[in-house]
Structures are given as C-alpha cells and as structure tokens.
Amino acid sequence: MRLMSSFNAVAAAGLGLALQTSTAMAQALEIVGAPVPGGTEHQPAGTNLAAGLQWLDHMILVIIAAIVAFVCILLLFIIVRFNRKANPTPATFTHNTPLEIAWTLIPVLTLVVIGSFSLPELFLQQTIPTADITIKATGNQWYWSYEYPDVKTADGETLKFDAVRLEKEELAAAGYPADTYLLATDNAVVLPIGKTIVVQVTGADVIHAWAMPAFGVMQSGVPGRIGELWFKAEREGVYLGECTTLCGK
C-alpha cells in the first residue's frame, strides 16, 4: 500500500498511472513493515489508531510487569520468612478479612483502569466514519484483489486489480529490498494521507484476514460476508501488510 500527499480519487487514469509506476514509488518512499532482525517493538505508527493501540499496549505491559514483580517479591518473602526453619510454629488463624478485601478490590480496580483506557480504543476502531475513499479487498489463495467502487476507468468499468506476491528475483526490479520477500506485491493500493479510508474485506474461497500492522487494523475476510475497517494515515510511505490467517487447504 502506497500513501502519498497528492492523490486524485476520481481520476481513474491517475490511479492507473500510479499502479503502472509502482517501481518508482517503491524506490522513492519509505518502506514500513519490513522485518527487523531481532526486533521486538511495534512498527512505526502510521495512524492515530495505531498510536493509541501502541500506547495502550505499553501501559498494560507496565501494569503486568508490576504485578509479576510484586508476586515474585511476595513469594520470595514468604519462602524466606515462613519456611520451617525460620518459623517452626505455624499460625493458627484461618482467614484475614482486610487482606481478603484487598486482594479482591485491587484486581477489580486494576481491570477497571485497563478497561477505561481500552474500551475507547475499541469503540474508535469499531465505529466506522463516513469515508472519503472506499476500497474493497477480496482475499484469494494466495493474493488479494482490490476494487475502487467509486472510481471508473476510461471505459466506464470499476477500477480493479490483483496484488500478487513478488518472487525473490523480482524484488530488485520492482524497487524493493530483499527483506520484503513474502510481503511486497506487483501492484499496490494507492491512497492519500489525511483522508478517511474505509476498507471492505471479504473472502473469495476460504477465510482470510486483511492486516496492516503499522495502521493498527485487521479485519477477517469471510466468504459471503463484508467486514469493514477504517484508518486515516498521517505519513507517506510504502506500507507492507499481510494476511494473518492460515488460509489454505
């Protein structure tokens, strides 16, 4: 997927030219989504949706790390303080009401805090706004077919094309580095930045999943059904997506 600052959504000829000159654009724009050796971080966020999800992920990671550290320290303290040698006479009480209240309320409050931040992100993703541009993505084994429903070609047909994976020996000629193998395609969706894009996802044969990690979006493509996602990209680039479902026979 290529995102550019200038784009004519109603000029089919312009879209055709953009698709035909994919090699030049691949060389001119930053490529986002290629594998990083030893990488453990998220891809650079290309949308506010992705930025929000990444912030939420980091926040929850901090909470989880704090819980794990607390449990480990508490376990170590109990092992040292209450082993048979240090505490030969065990306690005889059977319960501790304040402690039981605490270990009930603290997890509940923790979940409430996490939910108060995660639910707005969920609603933001699932509430589809009015689209500036709509595209349809149909999953096939093993490629994607795209349509621009609102864009017509010179002969009045809806603009559509297939995006087929490039083989290793084809990457250099198309302007892609070797590490984009299994991600780069011969044709790419071309869209503008700063516009609301709605993607309608379906499958032609089996269940697929259209995913763009840098945008923080993923939608299953089920044959006979239409699922929708949306995004508004904030930076130019060539973004590499993938199918995140084992879609084969």
Predicted feature locations:
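Alpha-helical transmembrane segments
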Residues: 68-82
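Active-site-proximal cofactor/substrate-binding loop regions of enzyme domains
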Residues: 64
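Hydrophobic membrane-targeting signal helices
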Residues: 20-21, 75, 118
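N-terminal secretory/membrane targeting signals
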Residues: 1-27
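Non-transmembrane, membrane-proximal soluble domains of secreted or membrane proteins
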Residues: 27-59, 79-249
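Hydrophobic alpha-helical membrane-embedded or membrane-associated segments
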Residues: 12-16, 59, 68-72, 108-111
